[in-house]
UniProtKB/Swiss-Prot annotation:
The gene is feoB. Disruption phenotype: Cells are unable to colonize the gastric mucosa of mice. This is Fe(2+) transporter FeoB. It comes from Helicobacter pylori (strain ATCC 700392 / 26695). GTP 1 binds at residues 10-17. GO terms for cellular component: plasma membrane.
Amino acid sequence: MKEITIALVGQPNVGKSSLINALSNAHLKVGNFAGVTVDKMEVGLIHKEHQITIIDLPGTYALNDFTTEEKVTKDFLEKGQYDLILNVVDSTNLERNLALSAQLLDTNKKMLLALNMWDEAQKEGIKINTEKLSKELGVVCVPTSARSKEDRLNTELLLDEIVRLYSQNTTNNENIKVPSQSFKESLKYSQSAQRIAQLVISENQQNASFEHTYKIDKILMHKRYGIFIFLGFMFIIFSLSFLIGGGVQKALETGFKFLSDGIKENVANEDLASLVGDGIIGGVGATVSFLPLIVVLYFGISLLETTGYMSRVAFLLDGILHKFGLHGKSFIPLITGFGCSVPAYMATRTLQNYNERLITLFVIGFMSCSARLPIYVLFVGSFFPSSSAGFVLFCIYILGAVVALVMAKLLKLSVFKGQTESFIMEMPKYRFPSWRMVYFSIYTKSLSYLKKAGTYILVGAILIWFMSQYPKSDAAMKAYKQESLLVNKDTTLSSEAKEEKLKELKTELDKKNLKNSIVGRGGAYLEKVFSPMDFDWRLSVSLVTGFMAKEVVVSTLGVLFSLGDQNEKSDAFRGILRKEVSVPSGIAFIVFVMFYIPCFAATITFGREAGGIKFVAYLFIFTTVVAYAFSLIAFYATQILV
């Protein structure tokens, strides 16, 4: 079977992801370029006995060295191993896209042109003469549409053309050199694009869609209440995630509890039963049960992104962000931080100003990622009535964003002083949501979450279980055996009373063994550090394990609080939390989780993006001080108010 490697190149917002998913019917696989923290996307498929690998390069307007995307794309085109270039252009904005196409043609590599969003161009009255365009460029041009299965156009034809072009014996396998554009060269490419566009676009009638966009923008982009509309959307998303996802979550909790109890009742070996029931199922199950809430959150944010609304919010907030030392482009990394800090850190590469980029990097962690959502849901459900849970959750996220702005201003005034840059960004058109893209977004992110639960969260839960079980206390075990013997010999007690008494003795033994374990001994020292907020050793230990992954906080608590009557765990041990943790401590714990250092993977990504290990040390100090200070304030404020 012959192998074909394709470099997929195009400007931002031309639908490359939609096209690549339509071609492959698969999900993109993420891989890192060596030494650069920018993602490339790879997908493989088989077509007519050819193994085709498509490499989706970062969206770029030109092959210069101005932005990281441009550098990465240019570097791959010069040094990467590929057979041909598939240039994706937006049919509704052909002239602007052809400037990049003209530059790609100068590489002398085999090339195809995909005229994407062809259906939208037709609706807008734009008619493109593809034969004339192919003649002018000297490459095959294929109209494509990939937003949905119903509207899919020419995907098979495009694959046929890829195979045909590859089969031609004109491959240039030598490394090429793409020179950076001077102003004169940029002007040449722009004039060439303008000339070709005028030749091939035979009709361009304005239609009602432009008027509709203008009317929608007058409302959503209003300079006074536009921000409140955005906050309203976010409030609805968070409320629905608690309302809809919460019901499914409780069903999952019940299922995991039933499974855990069944194993502990039917497995004879007590340690093995505890490992599987409390360690594996209790730890991993506590994490997996929060997936429905995360799915609803991803769904809401994906809808806002695919309609083109999120990019407009960046413009809407540019003035506010500049006042706090940030840039309008900072909004995209910040809002991405609600999903995961890793891609959020990577998204800062669009910021050209060094100081603004570092400020954004330092405050992204205050935007609560989806991994923290299970912790919030657990504690909000424990200390607040269900009727107000959605509002409290919304306030948590808003507070994180407000603190991020305040800290950004402090960093701007103290550490990262300098001039700000103006904001130039393409405004995409409003579009109906692509349900296929929304599905792919939710699917891939949910799958990533489940993979975490099945890998290092599982490992973390098992490690926490072992460290919480060993070493056993010989003295406690000896006392337990003696007292159990006395209870069994006591003829004055009924069988029910004996069973209850033995259960109390077992609970006491478990508590003593836990305090004598590795976790218990380490937690005793950590408890001193967090004593001002009255965190017990279990809460303290969970914060440390949370550095591995924030989801591990819930699984750690699930293991450490798995004592006593297991029937009390009906609501993901919320009842136990209410008994064991005071309201001020619970609120302080939420606040600390909001602001302390992100997970290990995110921290490593931060270090690469910021410029080295010293910045990781700065991040640890910065986030720890902020988290501790605000947690302390929350603790004493709650004590006064409650």
